[in-house]
Amino acid sequence: MSLELRLALQEQRSADLEQRLRRLLGPFTSTEAVLDAGCGTGSVAFALAPYVAEVVGIDIRADYLEAARAAAPANVRFEEADVTSLPFGYAEFDLVCCHRVLHHVRRPELAVSELARVARSGDKIFIADQLGSVDPLLSLEMDRFERLRDATHQRLLPDGDIRGYLDANDLLLLSSEVTREQVDLEERLELAGFSEEERVRIRGPAPANPYEIEVGWYVARKPGQ
């Protein structure tokens, strides 16, 4: 995803995201150390910063991190790192977040395992992502379309896969919900800077314009005190 599109989406979603995170993850005590894994340009980090002690954001995209650092408040810092191999010790964070990242990850099960590893016992892990279909043919078609639109796309995970990864790491699911979003394809193509030739190629397998996606929101707890 281009930096320009990422920043535009962050601006569009920021108010709703902050409200949703406060509802799903609060109340906060202002003492929490938070990890935003796959932070992009900092949407989750910036939403949580006023309510916690510290947020560390990690991403593999240097351009995203540069943009995030330019806007970061004093209690937020960013590091270049891979969500499947986090550069942190066991149980370092009170809250671990992974927002719209797993569909970009080749081995999402490793990412969830790392999220669980760095979370403190008794504390929360938050995952949100666009969901895939349980129908394998529909899922393949949607993944094909998403890869044309965003070369970093790997695979949309069905709800059951995400629940399975949480289960495999002995994480207790506290809450989950699914929301629906309308996506304006032409607006996304414009913001991403595609040429007209590229736009024609992407429009071909597009489900519709606008089209609807489902986003799953999961809050889990790591066992222990």
PLM feature segments, named:
Residues 1-38, 43-47, 63-67, 71, 126-148, ...:
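Conserved class I S-adenosyl-L-methionine
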Residues 41-85:
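Class I SAM-dependent methyltransferase SAM/SAH-binding core
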Residues 97:
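A conserved beta-strand element that flanks and buttresses the S-adenosyl-L-methionine
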Residues 109-121:
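A short glycine-rich, Lys/Arg-flanked "PGG" loop and its adjoining helix->strand segment in the class I
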Residues 154-170:
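Short alpha-helix
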Residues 172-225:
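Conserved Class I S-adenosyl-L-methionine
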